[in-house]
């Protein structure tokens, strides 16, 4: 499952290496972990609950790009943020298992769009894959830095 893939991709990453960014616009491994933690708590589970059970409440906005600097993602403790994310993920999995006959076609309309419960759930899974890909790419950059001056072409096309 994607949780275990994320856990494996974070395994063995030293705190200082987790803060490295390939360029000024890119996220570090630590920033990805912090983002996953915030998304787990404040976006996907929360908004899926809005769609399924809280139609009369106001959908709250998220600011994924802003949170990176506002919440000082790259200054956080890697081990603590990993633990926080995995605890939240367990809460999410328990919450999902506790849903009784969810209506995946039920929709919620925000000021931006209408989204169904099924679409939100599918996007949650897709979001994990997006960041799994990002973590793989960040690990590749890390490997390039560690193995320099040697080139990695023989390993295959990247």
List the predicted regions and their residue ranges.
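A glycine-rich, hydrophobic loop/mini-helix early in the fold
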Residues: 1-27
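Acidic/histidine-rich alpha-helical segments that form the ligand environment
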Residues: 2, 66-105, 119-124, 132-134
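Short low-complexity stretches enriched in small and charged residues
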Residues: 2-5, 45-51, 86-89
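Charged/polar positions within long, soluble alpha-helices
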Residues: 8-11, 15, 49, 53, ...
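Short, contiguous alpha-helical
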Residues: 19-64, 107-158
